[in-house]
Amino acid sequence: AAYLAYNYDFTMLILESLKIIHEEWCKFELIASMGYGPRKYVKGSYLRPHADKPQTHVISSIINIDQDDKHDWPLQIYGYDNEVNEVYLKPGEMFLYEGSKLLHGRTQPYQGTHFVNLFLHYRPNEYHIPKVEVEGAYSYKDLNTETDWIDFSNKNTSERIVGKIF
């Protein structure tokens, strides 16, 4: 189980304040698109491997705010080499990653009492998002098939959006 203590003003302040760090890391201009947290996980929590929303979660970060000192809880993330990497964060540390491209999760149930993270998400200032016409209006295209993802990836992958080694 996870508990969300959302505070819009706080989250937007952090998103805007840390945007420059994310821009320096990925080497292009970003728009702050979404933030979550603080989110508290408790004993038994887990997170299935997933990729985030490509409309808003292109460049992402996780900031560990607090955790039970006795229990680590690694983030598993698949790199561009399809190898699983485990990332361990301590309070005050931040991990940057491409949330909509790299499969990630926490597959081992958490054994501690609490694990608190803040999640920040950005998208490039200039960014192609597939759209489809629905009853005379345009909406974002769902990326459900392998062809959809290949088309999306081909239009948005370049030297400026490749993965960074962590």
Question: Where are the predicted features?
Answer:
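A short coil-to-beta-strand element that immediately follows conserved catalytic motifs
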Residues: 28-37
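Catalytic core of non-heme Fe(II) oxygenases with the double-stranded beta-helix
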Residues: 43-102, 106, 113-118, 124-138
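Double-stranded beta-helix
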Residues: 114-166
